[in-house]
Amino acid sequence: MTLYDEDNINLIKDDLRYLKLLSTKYHNIPSACSEIINLQAILNLPKGTEHFISDIHGEYESFTHMLKNASGVIKRKLDDIFGTSLMDKDKDSLATLIYYPKEKLEILKESNNDLEEWYKVTLYRLIQVCKSVSSKYTRSKVRKALPKNFSYIIEELLNEQADRVNKQEYYSGIINTIVDIGCADSLIIEISKVIQKLVVDRLHIIGDIYDRGPGAEIIMDALMDHHSMDIQWGNHDILWMGAASGSKACTANVLRISLRYANLSTVEDGYGINLLPLATFAMKYYGNDPCESFIPKALDKMLDESDKNLYAKMHKAISIIQFKLEGQKIKRHPEFKLENMLLLDKINFDDGTITFEGSTYKLNDTNLPTIDPKNPYKLTKEESELIEKLQGSFLNSEKLQKHIRFMYSIGSLYLVYNSNLLFHGCIPLNEDSSFRTLNICNKEYSGKSLLDLFDKYAREAYYYKDDDNVKNYAMDMMWYLWCGPISPLFGKHKMTTFERYFIDDKKTHKEIKDPYYTYRDSEELCNRIFEEFQLDLEKSHIINGHIPVKTKNGESPVMANGKLLVIDGGFCKAYQPQTGIAGYTLIYNSYGFLLSSHEPFESTKKAIEEEQDILSSTVILENSVTRKRVMDTDIGKELKEQIKNLKKLLVAYRKGLIQENI
């Protein structure tokens, strides 16, 4: 910028109100100059490491470990730093200490005869690791990541060289004193946490924190403690968000899925939702019903027969309520075009059959005591009272509401970040690969505008208070996001939940995937999507989750010549036999992209006691000779804008347009 160009002076005069506001922070020329120098220096630092994880499905142990080991980044750092100077078993032990410092300390202390020496060696090693992971950040940023109690000490250790002649005794003295006064344990724990924090600059969760796993609330607690992250909502997340907003249909779906997989710990223990009214209702109407199609799929859980039978009855009871509520929505919204999900009115109660789409099928279960054949979608008085109570429990769960507010505050349906497009499911397409349109309120939406519309409705469902009609419509759209054929989160032609429970003929169970999944290996499609979202065709990537990659069948997570990456995390144990692995995660550092495939995680206990890490194979997808700098990122764009404004402020000071405060 030419400082004394008259055109620039006019621009500065136009921005004078903003510049006066800026001058309250930078009072004079030296302070503005200092900040320009600082920001310009930051632009030249290597970009921070981004970590992409998807489809956690409530599996908190695997996820927590993945968060701690940063998909193998910490192990690779230890190899880079120590090479062959440390044996593999020592590096494994150090890695486990960094992941689980408090728990591992207790074990290591018991097995070391010379504890004082072990403390000193361990602290030296941890400081080396911390120096390495903090080297791409400014001192100011590192300082903010340090714990208050040990901030000064850790900063001194990070910024001094132990091998410098003049500082050897000073450095050693700090370490010796830490050990002598009994602070070594606390410092080891805090440095390990700092390493975990600095090794990844930004975490991206590409959907489905919730589902059948037992610890979604534990995962949410961990994410709320994370220093820098975002979430792209998944289909299961939307269901919980809808339930927390007050949608009865979403509430029924959440409970049905929880009962289907015998996962009541999140609902009852995590969020304090009382299911006794549902159990009482189920026993009253289905007490003598074996509910065979509703026996929970317990996977690795051990359930006694009485629990299994009770869950099956509760499962059936809430499923019937769900089908009724969904039928009411479909009839209320013909624009959703979901008439193919209206099945209760197709049942012939005399012979136990159902006729739809030109075929008649025998029902495997005809005990439907709460369905009125003349008005099948009407809730009974007791069903209505029950779903009201359950809705109230979700609305009044303090912890659930806290988690969902967080999900809204840092989440969205999609995200453009550093020239990459992140979304959970798909961009709905027609058979010819053109963007599919949805007509809402006599206006057509497709591509980006469709995702923006759904994002708007998702927020209105939770936050809108002024008009019940607006809020109710938005909540219905949340439910559509769960199961609608033009939903970017569902991505199938129809949800066949009723058919899977009540009809044995598997051809009725089929859910045809959106054409997006046929065309996503096409560079041409990816380029059209990039254009739709105004992204660089050469540099950008689409990063997806949702559909597990069946590696054992030869499927690849890298598609469209590297333009699209599928990273379903594979945390869900039910999918692991189908995929052959425990999924993929992605790392994007200053050199490029690293794709890691993972073996199943056994347990936190084994990780700590036996130092069993998640076995990962890493493939370098893109490796740049020139490291990407902060100036190449979204943050870099913001910093350049700040520098531009600060330079304007300098001119305003020098021209006397704004008075300096010396």
Curated annotation (Swiss-Prot):
Its cofactor is Mn(2+). Pfam families: FBPase_2 (PF06874). InterPro entries: FBPtase_class3, Metallo-depent_PP-like. It catalyses: beta-D-fructose 1,6-bisphosphate + H2O = beta-D-fructose 6-phosphate + phosphate. Its EC number is 3.1.3.11. The keyword Manganese applies. Keywords: Carbohydrate metabolism, Hydrolase, Manganese. One of its GO terms (molecular function) is fructose 1,6-bisphosphate 1-phosphatase activity. Pathway: Carbohydrate biosynthesis; gluconeogenesis. One of its GO terms (biological process) is gluconeogenesis. It comes from the Bacteria. SUPFAM superfamilies: Metallo-dependent phosphatases. Belongs to the FBPase class 3 family. This is Fructose-1,6-bisphosphatase class 3. It comes from Clostridium tetani (strain Massachusetts / E88). The gene is fbp.
